[in-house]
Amino acid sequence: MQELEKRLEKKLQEYVSIIAEEYHEYIPESKKRFLKSITSFEKCISISDTGTISLFYRNNKIYLPKLAFLVLEQLKEHEQYGFDPNHKCYNEETIISNSNTFLDYINHAILKGLTPEEYYQENLLHEAMHFCGCGGANPLLEGITELKTRELAKKKGLITSGCGYPKEVEVVLRLQKIFGEKLINTIVFSDRTLSETVEAISGNEIASLYRTINVKMSESSYQYLTAKFDGKDAHIKKAQLYNKIDYSSVHELLDQYELNQMLSGKINLENEKGDVKWYHK
């Protein structure tokens, strides 16, 4: 176990370095000083009995579930286990936006014959993004973190699952398209609240929209985000509960916002090479 932790610590150190370089203009100085002060990542990762199958970040430490050993061991009983050792849940075209859920990830784990170390590695980049930025804690921030994880994985050829928070990523992609990448990048690394960050950059009206979206998403996913997925069937519980999340009210809100902005002349809709493109004046 210690050797495994050492390999993961080394990988985390690599990811932190990449993230710090890629997003240096968005990372607050206090966080930059903290990251530079780390002389060893030994205390930054722990494989523990966390009572859940999920990885999570808390107080400058990433917790990896020991439960993964039990869950992945029982998948070996499946007749298709290890059938495709090179299996991936995405390709270059679908890594950013896809409809994968944890059910797809379970299927991936079976086909690939996923080991606990591979499970940790495929989800470590997302946690490294938390380590360098915000702590998550709500579905909107998790979606923003996952989108940045996927974008970085695609750009740098890094390992990721491509299955984390797909419904949240769908919402964030719309927000990024409407309000721009700079705002989303700032949010993921901000040391202020979501509302304060958005208001400072885009004003109170848009901050109010973000607050409403955040509340709606939190209400829709409360049961999932507060659940502990434990036991040998933890992966099934997690997949089933996630499938119940419905953000249709959030998408309706964004539909109405885009329509209002277009009608008021604040957003133009033009056809460029056959593609519809939204942009702010």
Where would I find each of the regions flagged by the language model?
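Active-site recognition of the HExxH zinc-binding catalytic motif
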Residues: E118-G135, E146, R150
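Pan-zinc metallopeptidase signature
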Residues: P166-K281
